[in-house]
Amino acid sequence: MIDQYKHQQLQIGLVSPQQIKAWANKNLPNGEVVGEVTRPSTFHYKTDKPEKDGLFCERIFGPIKSGICACGNSRASGAENEDERFCQKCGVEFVDSRIRRYQMGYIKLACPVTHVWYLKGLPSYIANLLDKPLKKLEGLVYGDFSFARPSTKKPTFLRLRGLFEEEIASCNHSISPFFSTPGFATFRNREIATGAGAIREQLADLDLRIIIENSLVEWKELEDEGYSGDEWEDRKRRIRKVFLIRRMQLAKHFIQTNVEPEWMVLCLLPVLPPELRPIVYRSGDKVVTSDINELYKRVIRRNNNLAYLLKRSELAPADLVMCQEKLVQEAVDTLLDSGSRGQPMRDGHNKVYKSLSDVIEGKEGRFRETLLGKRVDYSGRSVIVVGPSLSLHQCGLPLEIAIKLFQLFVIRDLITKRATSNVRIAKRKIWEKEPIVWEILQEVMRGHPVLLNRAPTLHRLGIQAFQPTLVEGRTISLHPLVCKGFNADFDGDQMAVHLPLSLEAQAEARLLMFSHMNLLSPAIGDPICVPTQDMLIGLYVLTIGNRRGICANRYNSCVNYPTKKVNYNMKDKEPHFSSSYDALGAYRQKLISLDSPLWLRWKLDQRVIGSREVPIEVQYESLGTYHEIYAHYLIVGNRKKEIRSIYIRTTLGHISFYRELEEAIQGFSQAYSYTI
């Protein structure tokens, strides 16, 4: 369909029976209206031509050959005279055969049928709106029981039963023969509602605005009651409150989309265009047909049998009619979702028939295989790797991908800056990779975001915007904190990069899709940018340190060298550093390793000074100074028992991790102060 802005779009939802007829019906010049499929036939076994009013009828779905009717006559396509657009003999319209890809038909059901998606889906929309248990609704739909139709204000037989229970017990001998009399059909139609027709009547009587008001009042009453102390009652109250919220949201959605609730019960069943459910003839008289055709045949046969029984309702037993209605309901359920009734339907070779749901859903379904995942212009694809130097809103694009994506922008700037005279010379400069090309490319990329997407895109965080930067190699660099939103890791995953062209698309990417603006999960509100997988392993390696404590003995605990003595000479002693910069400098000079224990001078902490912890060892020097050694820190004092400095026992990995946290907190504090 095409919206008001002339954008092609696909919309899935409920439609009215009038809309289904409008999709299928065609008015012939003789006044006949075609569009209803009434026969389960496909092709004639002798002529191999589509059967009239069948699943491949040319009058309903259009000609098989462009401009040629079923009789073999041809007319000029697009003739002005209305009578010349249709064959006078067979009634086939002279149009292009491609109409068979989108021209629909319909089956007029002899009884209403519930749509299995809305009855048995989770949550069940029908049960939600009617505020009734799903099991009772299923029993009503499949004829397990009936309910009294409140059509009049006078007491009916079923409602009088509660008033005269004792009298009914004495009249059982006269009630049973009544159900087999011809007058029972009239009584049943007037007093009893069963099947999907009963559901349709209840849905048609609903006032959605009253449902919203009543649900809101009940929710407020439950909210005011608070907690009773009974765990079971409180749990029931919470479940009821959640149900009321969902019911209000569903009713509001029906109102906003102008959809009537009774449309969830089908009176007309749409028939797909024949090109979407083809029959293919192969060599050796082999015929390959779509499973949808067999399921449509099953529906039409059962529906025709029910229509025949209803025409002769005076002779047909009521139980037989109800049983046939149940068969029609099950046939439509199998067509829409073959697994909805337990075991799916199988053919003679024990192969499961593929229903409409099976054709649509999954990786091999119509949407993901045929409509999604196609190649588009201004896009690329590559493996993702960690970019440790990137900010959260940045991604690294390889030179090869970047120059392809931004080629037109680079050519425009080359011509604008008079670096070249025409497009051909500009392309040659790009091909020869001249230095000016990379300068202009960086200028173009500086203000132009890109979109990164990882399939499958299951929620909105599966595609996010980033500020691109040029990197060497052929892989896309990504900040590890954004991996959870994409459900990605760095074990060979690939991601697609797209370039938004219009100003509207770029503005949307900057305002709504940038990664640093999507820090919380849109579903539950929990933080989505949290360390996972590779980042957790890196933090573990960074902070694991040397497990040998300060009180370790002089023998190495390594399994491979259980008796090797540790050499405690001057070189192997734990070094002392006055600042973290000195420790980092020693690491760059390869004087210490990442997990080597060291002593780092720390600010005087009153919690340490006032601690009552007993030192492990006290070392005195010749000048009167002393060192009090504890498990995780060291105090240096002078001869006057004054504390001169404190050293903590740590590793370079812990120092690096602490510095990163400190810088992040300072940056957040500055940003928060600017907003205030």
UniProtKB/Swiss-Prot annotation:
**Catalyzes what?**
RNA(n) + a ribonucleoside 5'-triphosphate = RNA(n+1) + diphosphate
Please indicate if the UniProt record lists DNA damage as a keyword: no
Keyword match Magnesium: yes
Location(s) in or outside the cell: Plastid, Chloroplast
Which Enzyme Commission numbers does its entry carry?
2.7.7.6
Give me the Gene Ontology terms describing cellular component: chloroplast; DNA-directed RNA polymerase complex; mitochondrion
UniProt entry keywords in alphabetical sequence: Chloroplast, DNA-directed RNA polymerase, Magnesium, Metal-binding, Nucleotidyltransferase, Plastid, Transcription, Transferase, Zinc
Which annotated residues bind Zn(2+)? C69, C71, C87, C90
InterPro entries cross-referenced by the UniProt entry: DNA-dir_RpoC_beta_prime, RNA_pol_asu, RNA_pol_N, RNA_pol_Rpb1_1, RNA_pol_Rpb1_3_sf, RNA_pol_Rpb1_clamp_domain, RNApol_RpoC1
Pfam family of the protein (one): RNA_pol_Rpb1_1
| Main localisation | plastid
- A GO BP annotation: DNA-templated transcription
List the cofactors. Answer: Mg(2+); Zn(2+)
Listed binding positions for Mg(2+) are D489, D491, D493
One term of GO molecular function: zinc ion binding
The free-text note explaining how the cofactor binds reads: Binds 1 Mg(2+) ion per subunit. Binds 1 Zn(2+) ion per subunit.
Q: Which family does it belong to?
A: Belongs to the RNA polymerase beta' chain family. RpoC1 subfamily.
State the function annotated in the UniProt record.
DNA-dependent RNA polymerase catalyzes the transcription of DNA into RNA using the four ribonucleoside triphosphates as substrates.
| Assembly notes | In plastids the minimal PEP RNA polymerase catalytic core is composed of four subunits: alpha, beta, beta', and beta''. When a (nuclear-encoded) sigma factor is associated with the core the holoenzyme is formed, which can initiate transcription.
Q: What is this protein called?
A: DNA-directed RNA polymerase subunit beta'
- Native organism is Lolium perenne (Perennial ryegrass)
Highest lineage ranks of the organism?
Eukaryota, Viridiplantae, Streptophyta, Embryophyta, Tracheophyta
